Amino acid sequence: VISVILPEEDMPFLPDGTPVDIILNPIGVSSRMNLGQILETHLGLAAGTLGIQAKAPVFSGHNIIAIEDMLARIWIINQANKNFGPLSIDLETHTYIEENSVKDWLNSKNQDYDKVFGANYPGEAREACLRIWLKDDQGIDTADLSIDEIENQVFLLNQQQNIAAPTLGKSVLYDGKTGEQFDQPISVGYIYMMKLSHLVEDKVHARSTGPYSLITQQPLGGK
């Protein structure tokens, strides 16, 4: 059910000014037990940003660490983009044309590019992302912290201050009408939406008199 249709300038927007296209009621995901929407949202964001194909078979799809690694790489690319200008992706080979910019940025943060973007190092991108994010954005020194202690810091920030780490797939959104920031970080990504031809005007009908049930005293079925 579509509750309201707004002009693009009134839709919530990301920190870079990009408006969202559709807003889904989060209750609709849990009530229908369709957690695949959340999975598709995260993988769609990763595929659109990293230039990859995200395939998720039922029993052999991406695990949590793999998804968090993808989200971490997106954040790393965006941070490098701020410092070294826009990055471009070769859509045929799915490789970064200006990957040296990302390498230089990671080297400045004492992180290994080959491990962060390597397929044989699961969890490396997530850990590097969280260490950099906690130090640069939250002012928390992570040099002497283990990965478990880092995850605990991320959990506390999320629970106590409503601050979402980059690996959670959430983003800060601003109200398109007032420009004010929403209280909670919100999941944002890419997802395929299909419109079904269920229109109210084809279903609504009314009558003054007609047959009714003797038990419930309600009108019988049909128009």
List each language-model region with its residue ranges.
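Long insertion/accessory domains within large nucleic-acid-processing enzymes
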Residues: 1-223
